[in-house]
Amino acid sequence: MKSKIFAILLLFAFVFTSCNGYGTKLKYQKTEVYYTSKVDKKEAEKLGDFLVSSGFADDNEKSVQLSKNEDSGNYEFRMVTTKEAAESETYVTIFKIFSQQISDSVFNKSPVDFHVCDNTFKTLKVIPFEARNDSLQ
């Protein structure tokens, strides 16, 4: 009887700690990559591999989330950062470049909107994807 109760409590604890509302978690070095049910695991793994190869995933703790906007069909790269980063034109420029790199390298040039988020993945600012004109390069 005690072992059944222990098993039930253990299962409850696992389910409770897994249900954070951020999605399923993958780990790449010290970067947490969450993905929602709107994308599949292979897409999230491809993103995680890119984050490692690009040097984004490193020894510093970071949290990102991958989702997809049901209305526009755009991918959403959601990153936990500061309110100051959301308001900085320098960071906005960097985030635009990074979303373009993710689009090109991970999602076959599909649009990727960058969401600057607080530590609960609440969006502070959306940086919409801007398609690059390849004929100008």
Model-derived segments and spans:
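Bacterial signal peptide processing site
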Residues: 20-22
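Short, non-transmembrane amphipathic alpha-helical segments
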Residues: 47-49, 56-58, 86-109
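Positively charged n-region of N-terminal signal peptides that target proteins for export
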Residues: 1-5, 10
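Post-signal peptide N-terminal segment of mature Sec-exported envelope proteins
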Residues: 28-46
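Short edge beta-strands and adjacent turn/loop segments
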Residues: 25-27, 54-81
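C-terminal motif of bacterial Sec signal peptides marking the signal peptidase cleavage site
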Residues: 15-18
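A short amphipathic beta-strand at an alpha->beta junction
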Residues: 102-128
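Solvent-exposed coil/turn segments that connect beta secondary-structure elements
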Residues: 80-84, 117-119
